């Protein structure tokens, strides 16, 4: 089989989620193919759906959607791409710490029922015999080197804890990719520099407020689980030992800021007053959004 050259990719994949991306008919079509039916067009304007569509477009263009392909999802939850891929490749393995931690409560992504009844979460009919679900820690992937044609993780690695844990998870993902195979990591990136993103300053605020503000900040980790570009390079990209298939485009269009959503406690306050587009969010410092990173292991 001749593998497509990554230099000839038809679009910029390694980039931030940007409002004009949703104006692309191919992205919209892929989005609608992957997510559950029934969303109004304006409800599709969300960064999670962008992540799904970009994954589908990249795997389609790179020739990875094959009957003999084996795919591993890290911190998979019960997201739609698992079921979509089960209908298109030979084997999908979904892994997560199902039933453990904050993402396992109230029907959230790591609900324990995924281990025994993944069909409960399926957005449409899928080939159940093509999807396996395992409880597994992303820091210790229980597969030999070079096991999977595709490994992917969507907006999860930023939640793995201290930088050392994040680096180990990135290295583990790359380790189990077959030569010539693909690694996709989507994570969350701070789009501007802001003094409040400096962890020691957040700790000072936490101390002065007696823990009422920025209560999870530490000297080594800010409150918001998102990366500055240099942290992304250091803690996610470099530990894979792989080169991204393209340079990363960190630019955003002005229209992406039109509905900046500010997170205040448990409330989300969109600038326009409308829930969508749900693309760019702001907590304590810089705004942040999703970043798509695709890598290929040398054959």
Regions found by a protein language model. Give the residues of each.
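Class I SAM-dependent methyltransferase SAM/SAH-binding core
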Residues: 72-73, 79-140
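A short glycine-rich, Lys/Arg-flanked "PGG" loop and its adjoining helix->strand segment in the class I
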Residues: 167-182
């Amino acid at each position: 089989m001749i593998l497509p050259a990554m230099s000839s990719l038809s679009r910029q994949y390694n980039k931030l989620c940007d409002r004009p991306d949703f104006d692309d008919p191919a992205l919209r079509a892929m989005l609608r193919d992957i997510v559950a039916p029934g969303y109004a067009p304006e409800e599709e304007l969300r960064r999670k759906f962008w992540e799904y569509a970009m994954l589908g477009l990249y795997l389609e263009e790179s020739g990875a959607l094959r009957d003999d392909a084996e795919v591993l999802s890290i911190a998979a939850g019960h997201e739609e791409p698992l079921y979509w891929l089960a209908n298109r490749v030979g084997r999908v393995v979904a892994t997560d710490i199902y039933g453990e931690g904050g993402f396992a409560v109230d029907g959230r992504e790591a609900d324990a029922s995924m281990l025994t009844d993944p069909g409960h979460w399926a957005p449409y009919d899928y080939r159940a015999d093509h999807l396996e679900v395992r409880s597994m820690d992303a820091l210790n992937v229980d597969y030999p080197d070079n096991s999977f044609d595709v490994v992917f993780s969507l907006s999860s690695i930023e939640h793995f804890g201290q930088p050392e844990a994040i680096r180990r998870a990135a290295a583990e993902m790359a380790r189990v990719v077959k030569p010539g195979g693909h690694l996709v990591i989507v994570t969350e990136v701070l789009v501007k520099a802001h003094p409040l993103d400096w962890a020691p300053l957040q700790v000072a605020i936490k101390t002065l407020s007696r823990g009422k503000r920025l209560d999870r900040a530490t000297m080594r980790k800010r409150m918001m689980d998102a990366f500055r570009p240099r942290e992304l390079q250091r803690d996610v990209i470099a530990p894979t030992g792989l080169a991204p298939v393209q340079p990363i485009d960190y630019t955003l269009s002005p229209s992406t800021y039109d509905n900046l959503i500010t997170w205040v406690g448990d409330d989300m306050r969109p600038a326009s007053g409308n829930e969508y587009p749900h693309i760019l969010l702001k907590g304590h410092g810089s705004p942040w959004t999703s970043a798509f990173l695709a890598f290929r292991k040398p054959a």
